[in-house]
Amino acid sequence: MYELSTLYAAFEQYFGHPPTRIARAPGRVNLIGEHTDYNDGFVFPMALDRATYVAARPRNDQIVRVFSIKFRDEDQFDLQQIVRDERRQWVNYIRGVAKGLLARDLPLRGADLMIDSDVPAGSGLSSSAALEVAVGYTFQLLNNINLLGEELALVAQGAEHTFVGVKCGIMDQLIAALGEAGHALLIDCRDLSYRPVPIPAEARVVVCDSGVRHRLAGSEYNQRRAGCEEAVRLLKPALGKIQALRDVRSSDLAMYGHLLPPDLLPLARHVVSENERTLAAAEALAAGDLVKMGQLMVASHVSLRDDYRVSVRELDTLVDLALAAPGCFGSRMTGGGFGGSTVSLVAADHVDAFVAAMVDGYAIRTGRKLQPLVCTAGAGVSCVYASEEE
């Protein structure tokens, strides 16, 4: 469990005075619904009990000073002149959020910020969105700003679009802002409506980090998003008023798929079928049908591997090992892909045997050390420390 006292002491030592607020925003694991969010589709994530923490104290000027414990690096910028840092990507998440809040005509004053996290970076658990939402919420606390969770998520997403250069969907930021303990959230990424679904007590969610790291910015992620948008353009003459692949059904693709070139048809097929799987998965989990939920997770992985082509050998190995391990209902890659993690749904009374089988199997197959995370569905962003001093 993360020790707030360690962050408090580090802040006081570095800045010379104690923090007045500490905020946390969780990482997330997506149970199913991958690469659907930027297609106006459905996703089914849960917030984790792993989080990014921001200790903060307001200043009397317009300067923001930041120190990242994880990167052992510092940044300083002026709220009146926020520009991208071309060398260091991590600082752009923070600068972008500040810029986004100011763009909404929200008054900000300078601040000292110290950031730490126990969300593994690059593992597909959305450490970046946790950072954005935690920083945005911290600025809210320091400046007496009241944004709805959905609004905070949109500010955070905008930071990633404009300052980081990744055209991400809204899922990661939304679950970081709105997560509910003990539940996954079925989110409609078109209108941002959501429905909490309880995770049955007899099930556990286990995340396995492949150890393979991805770089999303400027990579194949943006190419796939562009491909999906092109598929919509090509299908519009036949299907009429479609705005995104969310509006296309499998039966539509069966009839009009010939309108798409060979490189785009598999992309569209994945997104369309994944939306259908995600809605079915929420119903299955709500009914406590873990077998059905697991089957849908496996079908999702096959689609991500074969049609969307975002899996890698290590992720496929983890899924194969999981499906052969004791008590596993289903397993799939989770996150953007090209590395990162898998998520498995496991019977609670088989978790220890499952974890042992995964560790041994992955070491034999790849020579890599695996540290599976048995995850609890956590709450969304919150203030975890507030002093009486302002």
UniProtKB/Swiss-Prot annotation:
GO terms for biological process: galactose metabolic process. Mg(2+) binds at S128, E160. Catalyzes the transfer of the gamma-phosphate of ATP to D-galactose to form alpha-D-galactose-1-phosphate (Gal-1-P). It is found in: Cytoplasm. Belongs to the GHMP kinase family. GalK subfamily. InterPro entries: Galactokinase, Galactokinase_bac, Galactokinase_CS, GalKase_N, GHMP_kinase_C_dom, GHMP_kinase_C_sf, GHMP_kinase_N_dom, GHMP_knse_ATP-bd_CS. The keyword Transit peptide does not apply. The record marks R28 as: Transition state stabilizer. Substrate binds at E34, H35, T36, D37, Y221. It comes from Chloroflexus aurantiacus (strain ATCC 29366 / DSM 635 / J-10-fl). GO terms for cellular component: cytosol. It catalyses: alpha-D-galactose + ATP = alpha-D-galactose 1-phosphate + ADP + H(+). ATP binds at S68, G122, S123, G124, L125, S126, S127, S128. This is Galactokinase. Keywords: ATP-binding, Carbohydrate metabolism, Cytoplasm, Galactose metabolism, Kinase, Magnesium, Metal-binding, Nucleotide-binding, Transferase. Pathway: Carbohydrate metabolism; galactose metabolism. Gene3D superfamilies: 3.30.230.10, GHMP kinase, C-terminal domain (3.30.70.890). One of its GO terms (molecular function) is magnesium ion binding. Its EC number is 2.7.1.6. PROSITE patterns: GALACTOKINASE, GHMP_KINASES_ATP. It comes from the Bacteria.
